[in-house]
Amino acid sequence: MAHYTRNVGIFVFNQVEVMDFAGPYEVFSLAEDATDMNTFKVFLVAQSAEQIEGRNGFTVVPQYTFDACPELDILIIPGGPGTRAEEKVSKVLDWVRTKADSAELVLSVCTGARILAHSGLLDGLGATTHWNSLNELREMAPTTIVYDDRRFVDNGKNGKL
C-alpha cells in the first residue's frame, strides 16, 4: 500500500485559544512518532508572517502565510476570542473556502466553527461549538443542525467536516 505524508495546516490568529491549536498540533505530531512514518507534516498558517499573540499572551510564529501555504490534506480551524474578528475578514473566509475545497478533511475546534459558519461551509451540515456560542452558531448558520449535546460531529466522508 502506498504511503504519503498528509499536510495538516492549522490556522492561527491573534487571540486564538492555545489549547485549540496546540492540542491538534501535538496529536498529529505524535501520530507520526507512533508509526515511525512521515504520516503528517503539521504546520501553522496565518494571514501574514508576523508573530501571533494567542490567548493570555502566548506567542507563535506561523510557518506559512496564506499566500505561501502548500496544498492541505487536513485543515484545522481552532477557536478562541479572536474568531469574532476573523469571521468578518473576507480574506480569511476566502482562504478557508479555497483550502477546504481541496482538503480531504476540514475540522474546527470549539468556536472555530464560527469561521466555518461564516465561510458557508456548515450549510446543511451538523455542527457543535462551545456551549456559550451554540445559539449564536444557530443564528449565523440557520441551515446548520447545531447539536448542543455532542462534543464532536462527523459529517462523513462527503461532508469533509
Model feature map: region roles:
Residues 113-114, 130:
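Conserved beta-strand edge residues that scaffold enzyme active sites
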